[in-house]
């Protein structure tokens, strides 16, 4: 542990780009969705977006096929309804007053068209696993081939064995950001070793001929999951790309178009929080000239961009963000050195604090959190940093285990508990670092390997893996747990870790460090974890277009499906205010939107139904 005062930068410029929507009087939109044979359809996603607007509102039908939007600004709206295996139904509504829009959904007649609609988790589930060999290949697809994108993007296409081999040839020379690094490092050993058999496996599943895949559609949302309302806020194209306003033809809103490409020019939306006034803030980790963090007015959709100067005329990049109990937004910022940014939403003033040059900097896949003593914690490549906002001092905590024959323990997620301790995930090494806030000591928690998938590895493969060095986060060993991002219960002594490859949440007692794995249904893969006031753990599934909530008391999961296909959320955060519905913020990295999901009670739905009937 090492302490040092921070260098403070106050000459931070705020460069704004304003994209505003006009405000009008509110009206109610409701209706009924039925199948082509006249039967009511529950759990159908119904979305509405005003002409020229940037906010898409989505709700779900109840068991009777009825849906009720919250009050919407007056205007002319595009309205559409969709469900897996059904064609997208499109309509329009004039909300100068309350309006109704009914739909009849026609079934898909083409299995390939249905497949194109699917989220990544259903695509992965459909991959064959009839033999141990198929099980090993499916494991590689589930981990290595989804390390930087959802499975629904590549697998919505069909290629023969040579085609899939060419794709693997490219991807084994790409890093976790999708950048080609063939001239800078050796190819990914795991893809290189398995290239021939993996290409054959993918060609059998998604080749030009008959497919070995068996798709099982899940039940549509019902109960609480069908009562929520989503507001999705478009983040604008980067003006410096000089593209027409209609450049993006697929943003994931119409599932029949498939999963969109991540190459949508715009601000990289990575982490997001609602401030205490209910407006959004998001981080940008994509190189650009205009924004470090962005602000979205949730009433109008107005976007305002704030720039901290970075190297070579670019904006300083950021990645992680948190909101402390006082409502202050903290984020990592790299202006040539890795530091912390502080923003007061009330004044929109930014200050940047930099560690001394001889101390480790913020870096890695940075996550930011606060502890119960008022300190801010952030990822550092080789451990974590703690920042004392009062003393304006940084303290460095170094990982005990860092470089190993199987890879380097670069920090991914970071979290802090109510006792003032910090935690960081060495994703490559299945290790959680622990920083003792009182003594400054460092310990570590080793996560047990995934024995089920480890047992599938052959003797020859095991010899290869004994010397295999993972070049990045997205090239894991078959038995890896993959601790990625995490969160603590601020009202208890529990750390929840999202194990992406193990498909579980690791529940860790912050006092005893005892570990218990809580598995997600269907091997769905968690990313980050946030804990609410009821001690429930929320996790965003970047490859499944959903967010899930785990109730430790009932040992039960609730899944909330997102309205956008290929959303790829990398973070989840909560806003819980007295007397108001819980809101969940979800930044869509692939689709370049930020969503707010609001939990609604049945009483609220009933009240809307009465108003709509007038």
Where are these regions (language model features)?
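Blade-level signature of beta-propeller repeat domains, shared across WD40, Kelch, NHL, RCC1
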Residues: 563-614
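Short, acidic Ser/Thr/Gly-rich low-complexity loop/linker segments typical of extracellular
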Residues: 51-66
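A short, solvent-exposed loop/turn motif at the edges and junctions
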Residues: 52-54, 76, 80-92
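Conserved beta-strand positions in repeat-built beta-propeller and related beta-rich domains
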Residues: 274, 282-287, 329-336, 376-382, ...
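Structural motif
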Residues: 30-41
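The canonical Cys-X-X-Cys-His
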Residues: 141-152, 198
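Beta-rich, blade/repeat-based domains predominating
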Residues: 242, 263-276, 311-325, 358-373, ...
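Structured interaction patches on ligand/partner-binding surfaces of diverse proteins
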Residues: 84-101, 106
């Amino acid at each position: 542990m090492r302490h040092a005062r921070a260098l403070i930068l106050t000459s931070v410029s705020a460069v704004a780009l304003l994209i505003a929507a006009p405000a009008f009087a509110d009206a109610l939109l409701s209706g009924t969705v039925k199948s082509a044979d006249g039967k009511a359809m529950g759990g159908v996603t119904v979305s509405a977006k005003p002409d020229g607007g940037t906010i898409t509102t989505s709700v779900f039908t109840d068991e009777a096929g009825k849906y009720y939007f919250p009050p919407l600004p007056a205007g002319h709206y595009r309205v559409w309804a969709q469900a897996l295996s059904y064609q997208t139904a499109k309509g329009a509504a004039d909300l100068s007053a309350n309006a109704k829009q009914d739909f009849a959904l026609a079934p898909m007649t083409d299995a390939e068209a249905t497949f194109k609609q699917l989220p990544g988790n259903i695509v992965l589930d459909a991959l064959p696993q009839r033999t141990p060999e198929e099980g090993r290949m499916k494991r590689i697809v589930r981990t290595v081939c989804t390390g930087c994108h959802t499975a629904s993007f590549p697998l919505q296409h069909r290629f023969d064995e040579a085609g899939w081999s060419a794709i693997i040839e490219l991807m084994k020379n790409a890093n976790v950001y999708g950048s080609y690094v063939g001239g800078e490092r050796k190819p990914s050993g795991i893809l290189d070793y398995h290239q021939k058999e993996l290409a054959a496996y993918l060609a059998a599943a998604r080749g030009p001929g008959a497919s070995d895949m068996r798709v099982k559609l899940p039940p549509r949302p019902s109960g609480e999951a069908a009562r929520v309302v989503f507001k999705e806020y478009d983040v604008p194209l980067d003006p410096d790309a000089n593209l027409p306003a209609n450049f993006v033809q697929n943003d994931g809103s119409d599932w029949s178009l498939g999963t969109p490409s991540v190459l949508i020019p715009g601000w990289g939306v990575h982490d997001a929080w609602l401030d205490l006034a209910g407006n959004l803030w998001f981080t940008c980790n994509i190189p650009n000239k205009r924004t470090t963090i962005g602000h979205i007015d949730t009433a109008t959709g107005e976007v305002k961009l704030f720039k901290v100067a970075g190297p070579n005329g670019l904006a300083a990049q950021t990645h992680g963000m948190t909101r402390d109990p006082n409502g202050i937004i903290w984020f990592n910022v790299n202006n040539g050195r890795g530091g912390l940014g502080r923003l007061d939403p009330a004044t929109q003033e930014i200050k940047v604090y930099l560690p001394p040059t001889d101390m480790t900097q913020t870096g890695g896949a940075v996550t930011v959190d606060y502890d119960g003593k008022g300190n801010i914690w952030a990822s550092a490549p080789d451990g974590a940093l703690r920042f004392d906002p009062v003393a304006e001092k940084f303290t460095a905590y170094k990982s005990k285990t860092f470089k190993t024959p199987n890879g380097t323990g670069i920090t991914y997620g970071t979290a802090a508990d109510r006792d003032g301790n910090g935690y960081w995930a060495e994703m490559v090494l299945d290790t959680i670092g622990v920083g003792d806030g009182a003594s400054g000591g460092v310990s570590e928690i080793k996560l047990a390997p995934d024995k089920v998938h480890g047992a599938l590895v052959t003797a020859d493969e095991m010899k290869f893996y004994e010397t295999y060095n993972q070049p990045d986060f997205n090239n894991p060993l078959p038995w890896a747990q993959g601790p990625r991002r995490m969160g603590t219960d601020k009202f208890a002594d529990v750390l929840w870790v999202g194990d992406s490859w193990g498909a579980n949440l690791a529940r860790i007692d912050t006092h005893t460090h005892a570990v218990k794995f809580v598995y997600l249904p269907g091997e769905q893969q968690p990313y980050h974890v946030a804990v609410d006031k009821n001690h429930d753990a929320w996790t965003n599934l970047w490859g499944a277009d959903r967010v899930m909530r785990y109730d430790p008391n009932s040992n039960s999961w609730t899944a909330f499906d997102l309205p956008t296909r290929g959303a790829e959320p990398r973070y989840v955060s909560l806003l819980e205010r007295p007397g108001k519905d819980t809101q969940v913020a979800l930044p869509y990295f692939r689709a370049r939107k930020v969503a707010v999901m609001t939990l609604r009670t049945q009483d609220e739905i009933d009240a809307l139904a009465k108003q709509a009937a007038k």
